[in-house]
């Protein structure tokens, strides 16, 4: 997902993208940032060809600023060979929808390739802002034009790429949450004995969200206390959360989704304020007691760094973080992490796990583009041709989304061994199997923003969990009525069918 960014490389990437992609010249960055910008080693696992050379056209690419635009720098030598110059337009992570929608409505034609979060596809495609891609994908020869959609995992193909039976986008980032924890602490004999003495249970990674609170409280220590046989020189925390305004709602949904409830019933009545949902939000609120005091300012970067700097015992994060945790240039806990399914709910004598699938990224061709064919090839080149290299490096936040990404563990060179990389990929498969989707209908941005606003108010103590979710239900009904309830009911039923085709709901 992600807003994910290696902060130390930010300045270099911005400079490199502006200089190298817009002008085609300019000095290369040096030092650690230069290493961050170095293209991954080509794997040659995917066969592709250049198109017939375009006549020096400029393709304008818009996307959220940061390391997920790095592939355009990695492969900057490819585009001139196709007769294409790339110009990058960076926007803030939280501003993607507003910026792109504003330009679409204005008909400015400012973009050729549009990078966006796939929950917006219903809005963008249904309003005619995106070019249908099906005819482009059929062009010959295959090596130039075919993005091999059959290789894209079903959730990312059916939900991320399609609207009303047509393909409008290509996946570049397949997102899901996983739990990441300090295995050295969970296996430490002294910590195991202390946990057993205190709780009468063996110390294990949390299976349920109740376990999450218990284990988080256990590992929360003050400066001067002992942790795994050493005296702490700063406070240490059992867990941390993405509690910042913007996407904190996803960490609430992680706790609620295993209930089997959906955002709406068949007639668009919100189910977001059920007793199970209220209990889930209360768990989220309670978890902040075991988190750093500034956790309400934690987005992706801060949550990642809290773990990789050795300040917390466990987090729920996107599946790219283990790659960064294995990279000594980004992590102080190399070799000390393990990962698995997010905690779940005990239902009917078993634990049910559901992992939220927030954000993700797709690339599409703007319907207003004057260079649609060139824009399509650029999108296809990033989404398919170079995708293994882009998802396997620790210097992007792009996550696996195709079968080929799982069958080449040797590409994930930040891990010490191929076996370790293969184990990581197995855990990612588990996370995706537990996947729970976002809202994939027009209005998704408004529904999710209302949810996030009130989740954040509950985290701040400004509303109780019940007050917060009752307010969400009221606002969701208002959004539905404003967009047209009967229309939204029809679209929601179509979305439910897509969820079923993708294997995400029964």
Task: Walk through the language-model features, giving the residues of each.
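Long, aromatic- and glycine/proline-rich binding clefts that accommodate carbohydrate-like moieties
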Residues: 34-58, 340-344, 393-457, 485, ...
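Hinge/lid segment of periplasmic solute-binding proteins
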Residues: 37-53, 118-178, 229-232, 336-342, ...
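Short, polar/charged alpha-helical segment
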Residues: 46-53, 65-85, 180, 184, ...
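Short, solvent-exposed loop/beta-turn-alpha elements that line the ligand-binding surface or hinge
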Residues: 49-53, 134-151, 188, 193-205, ...
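Extracytoplasmic/periplasmic substrate-recognition and gating elements
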Residues: 105, 161, 184-185, 282, ...
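Extracytoplasmic/periplasmic solute-binding protein
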Residues: 159-173, 177-179, 207-269
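Glycine-centered hinge/linker elements that transmit conformational signals in sensory
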Residues: 211-220, 251-300, 338, 342-345
